[in-house]
UniProtKB/Swiss-Prot annotation:
PANTHER family: D-ALANINE--D-ALANINE LIGASE, D-ALANINE--D-ALANINE LIGASE B. Belongs to the D-alanine--D-alanine ligase family. InterPro entries: ATP-grasp (IPR011761), ATP_grasp_subdomain_1 (IPR013815), D-Ala_lig_Van_CS (IPR000291), D_ala_D_ala (IPR005905), Dala_Dala_lig_C (IPR011095), Dala_Dala_lig_N (IPR011127), PreATP-grasp_dom_sf (IPR016185). The gene is ddl. This is D-alanine--D-alanine ligase. It comes from Campylobacter jejuni subsp. jejuni serotype O:6 (strain 81116 / NCTC 11828).
Length: 346
């Protein structure tokens, strides 16, 4: 199957998305097309040989062919006709806003474009950490207790320290602060509110373990990656998260009991099915006192979490093969014709 990778977007995670696409180019062993969405949300067709950081940092991409989107795919303007970008399935690799908040999903569904990525409802629930917690609770998956802080509202909630403060609609550890006592609270809130009007506050637990599990559903069967235990300090910062997947070191599966592995997989299944069908996602979990808690859902994980899979290419192609487009409704205007044929026309 021929894929096009869509990356970039008007997002704080724009550059991360570029890194993801460059890494994935080295991983997918078949012919690829690359569609870059710049900060103005204009699409460009990037030749494979120009998929490098310089193309984007110098804005040389603007010299490439501009694309537009319409029913059935991406097109460029030719001398006499429009030329369709040849691909069978688009991989949504835009991180954060645009790619994970539902905009791209809605656009692709509206224009009947086959794609790998979260659909609209899944995007909405996974992009907002508060909604993610409510969704997890509804399907029987635990999350850590939390408090919400709203911009321009004086919260009367008494916070416990240390705590961790996160923007509700941002990933990649951007805007996150660990607050060890009250004197650091206002600064952490100011940092968070630079990125979002809503902040999630959780108690920071030193003895907690974090594990990542990626997967998808193919023909009603789950395909899982290995379970990863991230190497970290207090929490994963920007560079730990997004430079780590650009390396080539072979990962070793986390040393966990079979009971805990099954608990993680069971929680993943509850989160994934049926909302995330058509997407390859990564769930980040906490384990505390032998209990599993969902930390967050990554609906478009960095480089699609390829490094966690033993046979990523087979998984990706099998996932794409079973994705179907929404059935179009045929409009015949019979009702309007019937009105038109009567006295007192509409």
């Amino acid at each position: 199957m021929k894929f096009a990778i869509l990356f970039g977007g008007n997002s704080y995670e724009h550059e991360i998305s570029i890194v993801s696409a460059v890494v994935l180019k080295k991983v997918i062993n078949q012919n690829l097309e690359f569609v870059f969405c710049d900060e103005e949300r204009r699409f460009y067709h990037i030749p494979s040989e120009k998929m490098n950081s310089k193309t984007f940092s110098t804005k040389a991409y603007k010299n490439e062919k501009e694309l537009f989107i319409k029913q059935g795919g991406f097109f460029s303007k030719g001398f006499l006709k429009e030329n369709k970008l040849e691909c069978e399935c688009v991989i949504n690799l835009i991180h954060g806003r645009d790619g994970e908040d539902g905009k791209i999903a809605a656009l692709f569904e509206f224009y009947s474009i086959k794609f790998i990525g979260p659909r609209l409802e899944a995007s909405v629930l996974s992009f907002n950490k508060e909604l993610t917690k409510l969704y997890a609770k509804s399907v029987g998956v635990k999350t850590l207790d939390y408090t919400m802080l709203r911009k321009n509202q004086n919260s009367k909630e008494k916070l416990s320290f240390p705590c961790i403060i996160k923007p509700a609609r941002l990933g990649s550890s951007i805007g996150i602060s660990i607050v060890k006592d009250e004197k650091d609270l206002e600064y952490a809130k100011d940092v968070g509110f630079e990125f979002d009007n809503d902040l999630v506050v959780e108690e920071f637990k030193n003895n907690i373990k974090e594990y990542n599990l990626a997967g998808c559903m193919i023909n009603d069967e789950f395909v899982f990656s290995i379970i990863e235990e991230p190497k970290k300090k207090e929490f994963l910062d920007f560079e730990q998260k997004y430079l780590s997947f650009s390396g080539h070191n072979e990962l070793i599966e986390a040393d966990l009991s079979e009971e805990l592995k099954e608990k993680l997989k069971d929680s993943f299944k509850k989160i994934y099915n049926p909302l995330f069908k058509g997407a390859l996602i990564r769930c980040d979990f906490f384990i505390l006192d032998n209990e599993v808690y969902l930390n967050e859902i990554n609906p478009n994980p960095g480089s699609l979490a390829n490094y966690l899979f033993k046979d990523f290419n087979t998984t990706l192609n099998a996932l794409a093969d079973q994705i179907s487009l929404e059935k179009m409704i045929k409009i015949n205007y019979n009702f309007l014709h019937s009105i038109n044929g009567q006295k007192g026309k509409l």
